[in-house]
C-alpha cells in the first residue's frame, strides 16, 4: 500500500530528529579493493536509465564506487531511506524535495536526474479518451484528472497547463492512481483524463487516447523534473564520496543523452517493458546540468498551489 507523501515526510523528520542520519548506520564503507559500497534508492522507470547505463559502462567502478541500486516502493521510502542512511543517495522528482526541504529535512541535491524534452506534444503529459469532449487543457476545469501522487509535481504542472490555456485549475478534481492503472481507468470512464509517463503513455495512446497537454513543457522550457540527492550528514562525513558519485552521474547522464539506443536497451535489464514497446517510447532528456530557472518555476508553482507554506531555499537545496 502506498503511503501518503506527508506521512513519509513525518517519518523522515522523526528519523532526522532522532539523529538517525546517514552519518551513523549507513554502509558507505570501503569494499574489497578500496571501493566504497553505495546504495541508491531509485524508482525502476525510464527516467533512471542513465544510472543503470553508467553502472554497465563502468563509470562508477572507475571511481571506486561499488554501486547497488534498490527500488523504493513507488518512491515513498526513498526520502526517509536517505535520511536514515539506508541509502547513501536517492532519486526524486524536484517538487517532492522542495516540499521536504521546507519541512526541515537535511537534504542536498548532488546531480541532475532527468529533464523534459521541451517539445510540446512530444513529452509526457495529459491524455484523454478517444471520444472525449475535452479538446484543450482549459477543458480540464471541473474534470477528474488522475495523478500518481496528490499535491505533487503532477497536479502542480497540470494546473500550469490549464492556466496557460486560459482555464481555471481550481475546479479540477485530482484522483490518485498508480501509473499502471491509469490507461484502464481512462478507458472505463472512471476518470476524464490521466497525467501519465512512459511506458503507460504509449499504452494509452495505443488505445486511442489523445495527448492534450504537455504539462512539463507548459510549466517551463527544458524543465528539470527529477534529481539525485543525499543527506547533509553524508556530505559532512564523506565529501569525497559525494564528489565521486556526482562525477559518475554527470558522465552517465551525458552518455545516455548522446546514446539513446543504448538507453533504450538498458531498460530491458531492470523493467518488464516489452522490447517492441521500448522502441516506441518517448525518451526524456538527460542533461548533466540542472536548469535552475525551471526549479525556481516549480518552487513558485508549489507556493502558488499551497504545496508549501513558504518559499523553498533553493540556494541551500541545489548544488
Labelled PLM ranges:
Residues 1-7:
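Bacterial N-terminal signal peptides that target proteins for export
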Residues 15-19:
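C-terminal motif of bacterial Sec signal peptides marking the signal peptidase cleavage site
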Residues 21-24:
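Bacterial signal peptide processing site
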Residues 27-165, 176, 192, 211-214, ...:
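Short, glycine-/small- and polar/acidic-enriched structural segments
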Residues 54-57, 63, 81, 85, ...:
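Structured segments of extracytoplasmic/periplasmic soluble domains
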Residues 95-96, 180-266:
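Pocket-lining segment of extracytoplasmic ligand-binding domains
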Residues 236-309:
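Secondary-structure end/capping motifs
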Residues 310-319:
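Hinge/cleft segment of the Venus flytrap/periplasmic-binding protein
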Amino acid at each position: 500500500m502506498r503511503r501518503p507523501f506527508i506521512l513519509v515526510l513525518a517519518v523522515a523528520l522523526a528519523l532526522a530528529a532522532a539523529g538517525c542520519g546517514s552519518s551513523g548506520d549507513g554502509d558507505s564503507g570501503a569494499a574489497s579493493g578500496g571501493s566504497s559500497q553505495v546504495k541508491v534508492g531509485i524508482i525502476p522507470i525510464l527516467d533512471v536509465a542513465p544510472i543503470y547505463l553508467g553502472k554497465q559502462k563502468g563509470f562508477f567502478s572507475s571511481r571506486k564506487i561499488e554501486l547497488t541500486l534498490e527500488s523504493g516502493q513507488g518512491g515513498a521510502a526513498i526520502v526517509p531511506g536517505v535520511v536514515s542512511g539506508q541509502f547513501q543517495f536517492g532519486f526524486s522528482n524536484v517538487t517532492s524535495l522542495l516540499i521536504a526541504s521546507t519541512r526541515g529535512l537535511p537534504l542536498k541535491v548532488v546531480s541532475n536526474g532527468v529533464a523534459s524534452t521541451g517539445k510540446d506534444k512530444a513529452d509526457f503529459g495529459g491524455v484523454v479518451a478517444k471520444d472525449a469532449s475535452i479538446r484543450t487543457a482549459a477543458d480540464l476545469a471541473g474534470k477528474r484528472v488522475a495523478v500518481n501522487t496528490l499535491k505533487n509535481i503532477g497536479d502542480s504542472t497540470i494546473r500550469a497547463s490549464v492556466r496557460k490555456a486560459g482555464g481555471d485549475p481550481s475546479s479540477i478534481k485530482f484522483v490518485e492512481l498508480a501509473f499502471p492503472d491509469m490507461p484502464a481507468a481512462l478507458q472505463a470512464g472512471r476518470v476524464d483524463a490521466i497525467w501519465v509517463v512512459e511506458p503507460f503513455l504509449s499504452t494509452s495512446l495505443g488505445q486511442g487516447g489523445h495527448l492534450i497537454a504537455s504539462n512539463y513543457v507548459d510549466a517551463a522550457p527544458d524543465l528539470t523534473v527529477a534529481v539525485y540527492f543525499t543527506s547533509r550528514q553524508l556530505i559532512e562525513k564523506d565529501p569525497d564520496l559525494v564528489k565521486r558519485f556526482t562525477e559518475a552521474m554527470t558522465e552517465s547522464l551525458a552518455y545516455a543523452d548522446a546514446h539513446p539506443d543504448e538507453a533504450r536497451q538498458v531498460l530491458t535489464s531492470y523493467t518488464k517493458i516489452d522490447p517492441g514497446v521500448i522502441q516506441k517510447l518517448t525518451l526524456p532528456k538527460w542533461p548533466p546540468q540542472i536548469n535552475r530557472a525551471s526549479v525556481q518555476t516549480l518552487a513558485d508553482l508549489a507556493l502558488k498551489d499551497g504545496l508549501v507554506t513558504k518559499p523553498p531555499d533553493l540556494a541551500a537545496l541545489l548544488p
